[in-house]
Amino acid sequence: MRDAWRFAVGTLTALPVRPPTRVDRDTARRAMLLAPLAALPLGLLVAAVLAAGRAVELPPLAVGLLAVGALAASSRALHWDGLSDTVDGLAASYDPARSLAVMRSGTSGPAGVLATVVVAGVQAAALATLLDQPLLAGALVCLSRCALWIVCCTRVPAARADGLGADVARTVPLPVAVLGGLLLSAVGGLVVLVLVRRTVRRFGGVTGDVMGAAVELALAATLLAWAAR
């Protein structure tokens, strides 16, 4: 369990932790199951930013943007990189090999940049409506990591034989993936399902980038659903 915790925290946050001594399929499965709990420090950070912004009466949208920035910094913007690369891959070609090569190149194209701006804007605008409910916002940040349960479901193949995606793909049991969809809210779960279906058809499976994209899209959709209540 210690290795799984180190794997989850070290992969999903910028917190300094010792690397796991061993990473096998069981460690990867436990790490993905621990993902929402590993994100607890990130959720508390977002809650603190919202509470502080409200206390000093900053403009709500500015506070939302600061919260998104703090969240990105606390996870090394890893999920944002995944979102950008995934959208670039989807926009690049219908050839799976070429799309995967574009994703692996590490450069951001116009499609990826636009997707990042739009999703970040949605997150910030939704967080701006939750200034009086900072703990709820923090909880939603943690729950957004349940998207990884869906992407890493045993029914979803990996697009590559190497990389982070291959390490954690097909590790989460189907009942847990279904629970993850329910915890995300109908909208968040649906968005992740659409992403998974699309990437499996286009790439032949999921990658670490797709997992990052799923987290950011799930957070945006879930925050928006709560903001619309």
UniProtKB/Swiss-Prot annotation:
One GO MF term: adenosylcobinamide-GDP ribazoletransferase activity
Q: Pathway, per UniProt?
A: Cofactor biosynthesis; adenosylcobalamin biosynthesis; adenosylcobalamin from cob(II)yrinate a,c-diamide: step 7/7
Q: Spell out the reaction equation it catalyses.
A: alpha-ribazole + adenosylcob(III)inamide-GDP = adenosylcob(III)alamin + GMP + H(+); alpha-ribazole 5'-phosphate + adenosylcob(III)inamide-GDP = adenosylcob(III)alamin 5'-phosphate + GMP + H(+)
* One cellular-component annotation, GO: plasma membrane
Record membrane topology: Multi-pass membrane protein
Name the UniProt key words of this record, in alphabetical order: Cell membrane, Cobalamin biosynthesis, Magnesium, Membrane, Transferase, Transmembrane, Transmembrane helix
Primary subcellular site in the record, as a coarse category: membrane
Stretches that traverse the bilayer = 31-51, 55-75, 111-131, 134-154, 176-196, 208-228
Q: Where in the cell is it found?
A: Cell membrane
Question: Which superkingdom, per the lineage?
Answer: Bacteria
Can the keyword Cell membrane be found in this entry's annotation?
A: yes
Q: What is its EC number?
A: 2.7.8.26
For the biological process aspect of GO, one term held by this record is: cobalamin biosynthetic process
Cofactor(s) of this protein: Mg(2+)
- Family under the similarity heading: Belongs to the CobS family.
Q: What does this protein's UniProt record list under function?
A: Joins adenosylcobinamide-GDP and alpha-ribazole to generate adenosylcobalamin (Ado-cobalamin). Also synthesizes adenosylcobalamin 5'-phosphate from adenosylcobinamide-GDP and alpha-ribazole 5'-phosphate.
Q: Which HAMAP family does the record cross-reference, listed alphabetically?
A: CobS
Its recorded name reads Adenosylcobinamide-GDP ribazoletransferase
Species of origin: Nocardioides sp. (strain ATCC BAA-499 / JS614)
